[in-house]
Every structure is written in C-alpha cells, then in structure tokens.
Amino acid sequence: MSKRYAVVLAAGQGTRMKSKLYKVLHPVCGKPMVEHVVDQISTLDVDKVVTIVGHGAEKVQEHLAGKSEFVKQEEQLGTAHAVLQAKPELAGKDGVTLVVCGDTPLIEASTMEALLKYHHEKRAKATILTTVIEDPTGYGRIIRDDLGIVEKIVEHKDATEKEQRISEINTGTYCFDNKALFEALENVSNDNVQGEYYLPDVIKILKDLDEVVAAYRMESFEESLGVNDRIALAEASKLMQRRINDNHMRNGVTLVNPENTYIDIDVKIGQDTVIEPGVMLRGNTVIGDDCVISSGSEIANSVIGERVHVRNSSIFESKVGDDVQIGPYAHLRPESDIHNHVKIGNYVETKKAIVGEGTKLPHFIYMGDAEIGKNVNVGCGSIAVNYDGKNKAKTIIGDDVFVGCNSNLIAPVKVGDRAFIAAGSTITKDVPEDALGIARAKQENKMDYAKRLNHGK
C-alpha cells in the first residue's frame, strides 16, 4: 500500500470570527476544531501529518503537540502557497497526500478513508471531495463532462449562469499523488484579483497534463461545513452535539431531552445512566453505570462512580465514589475526593477535601482543605475554617465523629475518632479520641431585661 501523508491547513487568522482567539482554536464541544480534524486523521494509517500554522502558531502547536509536525506560513498568500510550505517535509516522497482544512471539525475518518480508497481505485493524480447542497452560493462548482469526468473547479464568482446552477461543490478536501502535487504547486500563479495562490488551480494544471482527476461525492454536506464566523461555529457545535448525544444513546445512556443536553466529545458515560435536561458534562468527565444526573447539574473533568445521583449541583475536577447522593445545590470544587455511600446535601461546598465512606454532610456546610474519616456526621452550618487571611491550613476529622450544628473548626486542627463536637462550638485546639469538644460561653438569662427595654419602644 502507498504511503499516506496529510496536510492540515491551519494558518488563517479568521477575521470574521472577531476574536482574540485564533480561528482553528475555537472549541467545538470541548475541543479546538483543528484538533478534531487531526484526531480523525490520526485514526487512519497515515505516516506523517503536517499542520501549516501561521497566526497563533505557538498555541496551535501546543494543542497538537505529539499529534503532528508543523510548518509555518509566514505570509498568508493562499491555500496553494500554504500547502507548498510542506515541501521540505513531503516533496519527493512516493505516496498520497490528504489536504484538509483545519476549520472543518465535522469531517470524519470514514469519509477520508473512502476518499483515499476511491483515489486509489481511479488511479488518479488528484481526487476532490465533493458534495451536493441545495444552495451552493459562494462555493466552487465541480464541472464534469457528459461522461461524468471532472473537467475543472470553477469558483462561484467566475461561474457562468449555467455553471452557477450546478449543485455539486468543492468541499476543500483533496487527495493527491504526493509528487504530482508538489510539482504542480510550483506552477500555480497568483494572477487573480486577490493576488493569492489557490489550491484548486492544481486541478487545472493536472488536467492540462492529461492526468486523471477524480471526484468522490459524499452524502452529507455537514461534514464539509467550514467555520468562518460565530454563526457557523454555533451550527458546527449543534451538529457535533447531535452526533455525540446520538452515540451515547446508542450505547445505552438515556438522554431525556437530547436537544437540551450538553456533552463534550471526550466525556464517557456508563450504561443505564439517565441524563436529565439542562445538564452540562465537560472535559474528560467519566460517569459510571446506573447514575442519575438531574437538571441543572454541571460536571467538568471529574470521575463519577456507579449509582450516583447528582441533583442540580456543580462538580469540578473531583472524584466521586459509588452510591453517593449529591445536592441539590452542592458545589464540589477541585480536588474533592468523595468516597462510597456519602451524602453531600443541599448548599454544601467542598474543596481539596477527602470525605470518607458513609459520611454525611447534609446541608449548609463548608469543608475546605479537610480530611474527614468514615461514618462522620457534620451538622448544619459547620465550617472548616481553613484560611487566616494569608495561609491555608488543614482540618482532620477522624472516624465516627459527630460535629454539632454551627461548629467552627479553626485549622490547623485535628478531631480524634469517635469524638463529639458540641453544637455552636468554635474549636481551636485538637480534640482527643472519644472526647467531647465544647467551646462556647455559658448561657446566662437576665430576668426581666427585655421587659425593661420595652422591646425598643
């Protein structure tokens, strides 16, 4: 089999995006669009991927590190000029080269594989990936002869009235014989209104040499959708989201309302888990089997065990064990580690906290920089006071501890196993095992005092 190469065009600034972020780095369902393209290419049997970078080169290289080689296009002088920058990496090599735009995040590996196969079957020097759309305005048209053989690509502005009625368009993805490509690129002219070197001109050059030029027509236009502005970005995200959600449902996940559920592309969800409307699952989140993620929940870069119920809560960069109840309105901040059979109730916040098996944090609690043992019950309104204005300190609570309501644990402090903290206490010293910690003023009732004040009258 011939060697395979790929060139990804990612040098454009994307002025129509009106953004400080370079165009190809705009995310589609949690991943920069150029990374979608390169990841799909990487599943093919490709010997080398070369990404042409320009604007934002360092950022693009950072995102694609280890996935591609890079060549910089110092001046953006057109698509043919961009591909020509890969000459030091690819020129003279036997094989075929895919050319794909980095702003087409919906392109699939199966389509590119079919293009490569068709190119080989037709023994072509160039094969154009085409599709048919109802309104081809603005796209280059594929001109064929009476036998269906490709004659040329005509840009919309240069097309005759008859040619403009053609609905088969150039998607901007190509497969070339590698040597023929770089030989033809040397002959591309910039004699046009824009003064740029256009890749479709390679097709004309090869046709003039009587080389075979083919066109592989794919069924779906959406794969070729190029993102040039925020409207197209939203459309690409919507189409990608539908693809992601459909895949999860095929794999045994219930999405109660798929159109109102956001799931990033790298999220993994176990079978028989139910995702209710209004949920956002981001980053590298992993959710186990038989979970329920209720409406209004957001989970990012976290690992959720099995049989977990999350009610209208936020979980970020945390780990949750099996059979855990969370929410409503809980907030698990980064580095929270919630063990099995834990209850995290309403308006509970954790941060850099380990919560041991069977422990209950029922409501209105803050545990930051804390290590909590097994079977602990923390009463309403209790706080691990971890910050003195300059430094963070740690609170350690042993197993089988009871912390009464409205207790303040002033870190650094340690509460031993089976200890009891009286409600309303402000604990500043360690509490030994099996001890009662109580730190509050003795109640004193001043008889008739309120009567003398006459309740402020």
Swiss-Prot record:
Origin: domain of life: Bacteria
Primary localization class, coarse: cytoplasm
Cofactor binding summary note: Binds 1 Mg(2+) ion per subunit.
GO biological process, one term: regulation of cell shape
Cofactor dependence: Mg(2+)
Reaction(s) this enzyme catalyzes, per UniProt: alpha-D-glucosamine 1-phosphate + acetyl-CoA = N-acetyl-alpha-D-glucosamine 1-phosphate + CoA + H(+); N-acetyl-alpha-D-glucosamine 1-phosphate + UTP + H(+) = UDP-N-acetyl-alpha-D-glucosamine + diphosphate
Region entry N-acetyltransferase, spans: 252-457
Binding site for acetyl-CoA: 386-387, 423, 440
Keywords: Acyltransferase, Cell shape, Cell wall biogenesis/degradation, Cytoplasm, Magnesium, Metal-binding, Multifunctional enzyme, Nucleotidyltransferase, Peptidoglycan synthesis, Repeat, Transferase
Region of interest: Linker: 231-251
Binding site for Mg(2+): 103, 228
EC number(s) reported in the record: 2.7.7.23, 2.3.1.157
Complexes and interactors: Homotrimer.
Purpose of the protein: Catalyzes the last two sequential reactions in the de novo biosynthetic pathway for UDP-N-acetylglucosamine (UDP-GlcNAc). The C-terminal domain catalyzes the transfer of acetyl group from acetyl coenzyme A to glucosamine-1-phosphate (GlcN-1-P) to produce N-acetylglucosamine-1-phosphate (GlcNAc-1-P), which is converted into UDP-GlcNAc by the transfer of uridine 5-monophosphate (from uridine 5-triphosphate), a reaction catalyzed by the N-terminal domain.
Family: In the N-terminal section; belongs to the N-acetylglucosamine-1-phosphate uridyltransferase family.
Protein name: Bifunctional protein GlmU
Taxonomic source organism: Listeria welshimeri serovar 6b (strain ATCC 35897 / DSM 20650 / CCUG 15529 / CIP 8149 / NCTC 11857 / SLCC 5334 / V8)
